[in-house]
Amino acid sequence: MNRFRVSKFRHTEARPPRREAWLSDIRAGTAPSCRNHIKSSCSLITFNSDRPGVLGIVPLQGQGEDKRRVAHLGCHSDLVTDLDFSPFDDFLLATGSADRTVKLWRLPGPGQALPSAPGVVLGPEDLPVEVLQFHPTSDGILVSAAGTTVKVWDAAKQQPLTELEAHGDLVQSAVWSRDGALVGTACKDKQLRIFDPRTKPQASQSTQAHENSRDSRLAWTGTWEHFVSTGFNQMREHEVKLWDTRFFSSALASLTLDTSLGCLMPLLDPDSGLLVLAGKGKRQLYCYEVVPQQPALSPVTQCVLESVLRGAALVPRQALAVMSCEVLRVLQLSDTAIVPIGYHVPRKAVEFHEDLFPDTAGCVPATDPHSWWAGDNQQAQKVSLNPACRPHPSFTSCLVPPTEPLPDTAQPAVTETPVGDADASEGFSSPPSSLTSPSTPSSLGPTLSSTSGIGTGPSLRSLQSLLGPSSKFRHAQGTVLHRDSHITNLKGLNLTTPGESDGFCANKLRVAVPLLSSGGQVAVLELRKPGRLPDTALPTLQNGAAVTDLAWDPFDPHRLAVAGEDARIRLWRVPAEGLEEVLTVPETVLTGHMEKICSLRFHPLAADVLASSSYDLTVRIWDLQAGVDRLKLQGHQDQIFSLAWSPDGQQLATVCKDGRVRVYRPRSGPEPLQEGPGPKGGRGARIVWVCDGRCLLVSGFDSQSERQLLLYEAEALAGGPLAVLGLDVAPSTLVPSYEPRHWPGAPDWQGDARVFLYELLPESPFFMECNSFTSPDPHKGFVLLPKTECDVREVELMRCLRCASPPWSLWPSGCPESGKSSFQDDVFPDTAVSWEPVLSAEAWLQGANGQPWLLSLQPPDMSPVSQAPREAPARRAPSSAQYLEEKSDQQKKEELLNAMVAKLGNREDPLPQDSFEGVDEDEWD
């Protein structure tokens, strides 16, 4: 009679919530990995953010009317490929990454901050870690797959218990059976394998699963005998099969869905037997009941989604709203939201239905790793989901001990924007969350002691740990100056300068722009003479060869260095009144490079010192007074993308097409002082010193052509970047324009129109996003003007020039009312006098060092806001409601009557009719 069995889930319906119940305004990543990208415990949700190596963390349940906030945890230096919560500890998270390591994290409980470092690190492996999963019965055991290798780890000892036999190709899935005795794997060689890792490393069984080698996944049912696999057939159709390990030669049942290229993720609840099939890039969920006894995959219901699915996860059964007959809850990850989709059986919602909610495995492990490896097969004790039987025993793993909570009076805040909260009845109801808005540290490297341009003493760091770090420039806005300041009608602009060049250069007096004409002509435009340029030909500098880069001397605003394809550097002197005629003879010509020149950079402190890089793979340091190269740096294996002087002028950093970042001490020797891994992409890169010379910022591309920013500790390049920030996929190179002691803007280059703004910190969270903005048209280049050009009275933070477009000025919004009357010394610290040299070329070459002078930007008639008297808070009179609440009903009644009597009173004033004038007696007739 089993074939006529009526399923108790036959009327199950999926209930997508209203948009108010979505976890909205998140930034999910679109990683190439075929994993789920989102996981949930009974307290937390974690997902892949749009930044490689960074996870978003949010409570499963909102607290009251407050908006839930997303915290960001920097886990790895590369993409997080897979993640999993411990089945026993809601706050123990394992992450695997393309950086070839597995890390275990203790996520924050009440009053705790995000971890600054992982509790356990496993690996590194030979290839990126693709799969990982915790053991279902023992705490501290997990399985991971990297390439063709599958390992079973004892996390406490940080050593593998065993390494399974190598597979024939990339392992796509590795999962534990429900009893924890077996491991099932799916491989790109189209084979399914069953392992008993405690018996032998070889597979005990294997069979061909799906005819297509595309992504294949496994999910075990509630018993060790049966599991489900998903994959593709020869027609590239999604395929689902039910297997019995006792009859492994063929599938018990199978079904075919639609044609798609996205991975089909099986979300199987072993207690109910409900299977949700979620296809990446699709807008539909399929729900089936797995019935091994028939055997069959019985359809239950389908759910149409409002947004494209990027990932999916099941919420643990202990977090379901059992009194509402919620038998399953799926979390859909889209680009900008997490949507909870509950599956409900239409029954009375005031009773607990034991047939729908059988006892499930509890959160106390049945055994330890040593006992399990010795053969112990005890199962976790089951617990009832009936609310009347709660609470259940809890467990905290000793793998990563919890930290001490902060005092109850101080709750830490989150680093990101609030996300839309969910109604308690709309699918996110769960036990109270333990995430209390942590700050955002990162484990990508050692933390430093202070920030870039903003003092972070102990008091400020303590405040940030309580309130969450946020940039004071987060409300900055980009504003186009009035058209009267524009320089327009510029014709013949050269749009084909090499990728190593910024395209144009500027100082406080003039702009130099290469033109698309023969002879390497350079136009020099006076900033003090804005307006429309004449239609006639402009006076130019005749360089004689195509321009590859150009730079103004920071200590001589009339001297311009121009590099050409003929491997020569020409120094031009522009008359003080401006360029009025064509100049054909440069002041000096520097020769020495063997091939065309890539970049030019003047020394920040010493006069007449210039660095140049060339396609001959060398960097030369020139003495402009003598007109010769005095130093030559070597060690590059490919094209040099960019170079930059350190703020103290003692070191020079380069980023190269060979994927390496190098730091030199030019006066010490020609070989690099240290090297480290750089961007993997070979399309272009930039490098700049930040955070007072303690860090290096590199912009470039990863292997997937995604543009990214990498932050390095300058003294530890070999350890890799402290943090990696992924932005978007675009062909143009990001050109970082850094404002010392403030914050950088990283504008897109050549054909882009967006400008990204970040404040940089040498410690976690490293990148603090500000208010990015988009220009109305694409720009060719982007240059910062000296700080002295800013209007500090109007709180103008930076002034920039855009090539082929009007000048730009950056203004903050949301300034205090005193911003226009007091000098904002917290926003405008003393700036370096970058237009006056500290050393001569000869002194620097002989080993002398110096520091720039500092200049206050405070106008003489303005007082600093830090010294402005603070207004005392106005006393608020108690409200009438509060006043009345303190009195009894009888007192209120008496006071009301007295007030009425006092208002009316016993007045003896004449009545209105007494003032009327009557008529004479004879008028009555």
UniProtKB/Swiss-Prot annotation:
List GO terms (cellular component aspect): cytoplasmic vesicle; cytosol; Golgi membrane; trans-Golgi network
Cross-link for Glycyl lysine isopeptide (Lys-Gly) (interchain with G-Cter in ubiquitin), residue positions? K472, K680
Cited Pfam families: DUF1899, WD40, WD40_4
Q: Where is the composition biased (Polar residues)?
A: 201-210
Q: Does the keyword Cell division apply?
A: no
Which GO molecular function entries does the Swiss-Prot or TrEMBL record give? actin binding
Q: Which residues carry this modification: Phosphoserine?
A: S462, S465, S915
Biased amino acid composition, Basic and acidic residues: 884-896
Q: Does this UniProt record's set of keywords contain Cytoplasm? A: yes
What organism does this protein naturally occur in?
Pongo abelii (Sumatran orangutan)
Q: Which family does it belong to?
A: Belongs to the WD repeat coronin family.
**Locations of Low complexity compositional bias?**
429-460, 866-882
Biological process terms from the Gene Ontology for this record are: actin filament polymerization; Golgi to endosome transport; protein transport
Its keywords, alphabetically, are: Actin-binding, Cytoplasm, Cytoplasmic vesicle, Golgi apparatus, Isopeptide bond, Membrane, Phosphoprotein, Protein transport, Repeat, Transport, Ubl conjugation, WD repeat
What's the name of the protein?
Answer: Coronin-7
* SUPFAM superfamilies for this protein: WD40 repeat-like
Compartmental location: Golgi apparatus membrane; Golgi apparatus, trans-Golgi network; Cytoplasmic vesicle; Cytoplasm, Cytosol
Q: How does it assemble?
A: Interacts with clathrin adapter AP1 complex. This interaction takes place at Golgi membranes and not AP1-positive endosomal membranes. Interacts (when ubiquitinated at Lys-472) with EPS15.
